């Protein structure tokens, strides 16, 4: 089913978790939060995740300069804590690596919003600069992109939240996400 955060095509009180990656700050929260509250069960949570590249690695620091800074000034926890409708229940940070070959790095760069909006010649110049960086640092087997995933468990606090449905759908046992 297709929907948006502002129009979730699910029954009232039908889900336990809403997972949002890299996007909560882009939603129209005045519309999205009541809609999330409508579909979440009374003990449901929003799982919000933001991924950031770890620029403490030299080649990644150079990549950051070539791409333009990522949302490094954006503080997801501060964003959550600043909104009285959001209650931070828990936070956890995870580090992981992604191995990228030359083509995958080019695809990654071409998918970045700050690159997509460039005129074609400027985009090609930027991609070529990143590929030169790849060639400088690759020792065979690809480059390891270090990521920091910041994960937050959030409960909604809305005064005008939808009252629990009296006809809560039966739990059919379907597990949509397995975090094990």
Indicate where each model-derived feature is located.
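Short, flexible active-site-adjacent loop segments at beta-strand->alpha-helix junctions, enriched
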Residues: 24, 52-54, 158
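A short SAM/SAH-binding and catalytic strip from SAM-dependent methyltransferases
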Residues: 16-30
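Conserved catalytic/acceptor-binding region of the Class I
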Residues: 31-100
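Short glycine-/acidic-enriched loop or helix-start segments at secondary-structure transitions
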Residues: 11, 29-30, 57-58, 163-164
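Conserved Class I S-adenosyl-L-methionine
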Residues: 78-180
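Conserved residues in the N-terminal Rossmann fold of short-chain dehydrogenase/reductase
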Residues: 2
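A short acidic, Gly/Pro-enriched loop at the edge of an enzyme's catalytic core
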Residues: 6-18
